[in-house]
Each structure stands twice: as structure tokens, then as C-alpha cells.
Amino acid sequence: MVKTQRVVITPGEPAGIGPDLVVQLAQREWPVELVVCADATLLTDRAAMLGLPLTLRPYSPNSPAQPQTAGTLTLLPVALRESVTAGQLAVENGHYVVETLARACDGCLNGEFAALITGPVHKGVINDAGIPFTGHTEFFEERSQAKKVVMMLATEELRVALATTHLPLRDIADAITPALLHEVIAILHHDLRTKFGIAEPRILVCGLNPHAGEGGHMGTEEIDTIIPVLDELRVQGMKLKGPLPADTLFQPKYLDNADAVLAMYHDQGLPVLKYQGFGRGVNITLGLPFIRTSVDHGTALELAGRGKADVGSFITALNLAIKMIVNTQ
């Protein structure tokens, strides 16, 4: 890395395990400066509950970034709206969570931070606070005015991107259009090259229907939409294989020769990845004008403040973000 960079972290729902994980993350050295967008008392109280040392130093945007030393974090303060009891949701803190996301996103857009790592949020509390909120991905897409973003989850062994995300099954076939596939594959291909350092990405593409349509006998979306798009993109030089039946694609003879899989919908691709690497996976938002990774788990309210939360996914998310920073320099 040419110079030390700053990575901003949002712990997510304050009553959940996000603050625990951030405190655990701070117990080791990092080659980047970790700037945590959070309430100071929340972090120090949670560190005390876990019996872990934590020193907060103020964020100074005009000073050079410094590698993170064990037991310390750089704090970009955002005040809680209500006091927090670990494991107990407070509706007003939905506003606090969104404020941390907005500040972190804006800092990435203005060049303060090289990447953003997000902890788990509780969507219900945010919506109960009167803030329409579908998820991190959609929030950052709108705030950054990105034309289109793509959700990808990854482990050390597997990357799975999604053509559609949080849609009911009944709506998916209509959503798989030539325009959508062109856009999603272009973003996936571009970010695999620029953010992952893969010169010529090899992408496996799932069919939509069982047996990838069985030649049109189990649905025609492959023939009418997916195959023509893949043929057009192959002419442009992209290395695309498919459409392949999803029930046979996820095996070594295909995956050993691929850099990523494109699934047509959420529950087509993610069960395999989460079975293989739950707790070690990372959620990546492709198509944003900055690097964003996230843990692949929820708020786990029942574990908050008890010292039982597994920091593995957060560590993986941060390590991946650091690699992506290096690839983009």
C-alpha cells in the first residue's frame, strides 16, 4: 500500500452485536486507520461489558492517516437518540443508525475514506422510526446517485452476484430483462477487474428455470433473454459460461474455472454460499463509486454484550476491503 488509508466503519444496530464486533476488531493491529462512526459511550460501555481494552482517539481529517494499533479506534462521533441496553431495541435509535450510514457514505464520496464496512442493522426498527429503509445496498445506491448497483456475496472460495435481490418469486421472471442483464454483467465484469484485480474475469451464469429451461420445455427465459444477452457480451470479449442449471453449476468442475457466479435471484445462489461459509462470508456492493463491504449476518440481539459474538465475518470484510483498496491504487 502506497500510503496509509482510512476505512470507515458503521457498527449498525446499537442494541445488537455490531458494537461488540467493532470492539473485538480493535483488539488487533491493522495497516489502515479504522474510523468508527458511532456514539462514544456506546463503544466504551460495550468494551467494558466484554472486558476488553479500548481507547478512542478523535478523528482528525486534516492529519495523515495512521495504521491502527491494538486496543484503539478513531472515533467520528454520532450521538445516540436514546440510551442503549444490549439486546433491547429502541425505536428512536433508527434515526441514529441512518445518520451513521449517511455520514460514512458522504465521507467516502468526498474522499475522506477509502472504503466503508457496515455492521448489521435492524430494518424493522428503522422503518418503525418513520424512515423508509429497504437495506444498506439500496440506501447507498440512492445516496451516491449510482446508476445501478449489484449485490455480491463472497467467501475465500466463492463469489456469487445476484441479477435480482429482494423480490418476491412471482416477480422475478418479469424482472429478468435484456437491459437488466446487460447492466448487471457489465458492473460485475468491471468491478472484478478494477476492484478484485482479475484481468479477464470468468463468469458462470445460472439459468432462471429448472434445468435452465430444458430447451424451452420448462420456461423460455433462457432462450428468449439470457442466451441472446450472453452471446452479445461474448462478442465483446467477456468470458461467460451459461446459462447453466443452478443445481449442477455449484460443483468443482465449473467453479474451479470461474471467478464468479451470477445467480438470477437471491435464494438461487446464496444458500450454497452460506452453507459453505456462513460466518466467513462478506457482502459487497458493486457499482458504487467507492468500496463497500459488510458482514453476512444479522444483529443477533440475544448475543449482544455477552462476549459470544463471532467477529470472523467482520475480519473477512475488512481484509477484503483492504485488498480492494490495494487493487484500485
Curated annotation (Swiss-Prot):
EC code(s) of this entry: 1.1.1.262
Source species, domain of life: Bacteria
Keyword Transmembrane helix (UniProt): no
Pfam families per record: PdxA
Compartment list: Cytoplasm
Cofactor note: Binds 1 divalent metal cation per subunit. Can use ions such as Zn(2+), Mg(2+) or Co(2+).
Transmembrane segments: none
Keywords per UniProt: Cobalt, Cytoplasm, Magnesium, Metal-binding, NAD, NADP, Oxidoreductase, Pyridoxine biosynthesis, Zinc
GO CC, any one term: cytoplasm
The protein's required cofactors: Zn(2+); Mg(2+); Co(2+)
GO molecular function per UniProt: 4-hydroxythreonine-4-phosphate dehydrogenase activity; cobalt ion binding; magnesium ion binding; NAD binding; zinc ion binding
GO BP terms: pyridoxal phosphate biosynthetic process; pyridoxine biosynthetic process
InterPro entries according to UniProt: PdxA, PdxA_fam
Pathway given in the UniProt record: Cofactor biosynthesis; pyridoxine 5'-phosphate biosynthesis; pyridoxine 5'-phosphate from D-erythrose 4-phosphate: step 4/5
Binding site for substrate: 136-137, 274, 283, 292
Residues the entry annotates as binding a divalent metal cation: 166, 211, 266
Record carries keyword Metal-binding: yes
Catalytic activity: 4-(phosphooxy)-L-threonine + NAD(+) = 3-amino-2-oxopropyl phosphate + CO2 + NADH
Quaternary structure note: Homodimer.
Membership in a protein family: Belongs to the PdxA family.
Other observations noted: The active site is located at the dimer interface.
HAMAP family linked: PdxA
Summary of the function given for this chain in its UniProt record: Catalyzes the NAD(P)-dependent oxidation of 4-(phosphooxy)-L-threonine (HTP) into 2-amino-3-oxo-4-(phosphooxy)butyric acid which spontaneously decarboxylates to form 3-amino-2-oxopropyl phosphate (AHAP).
Name of protein: 4-hydroxythreonine-4-phosphate dehydrogenase
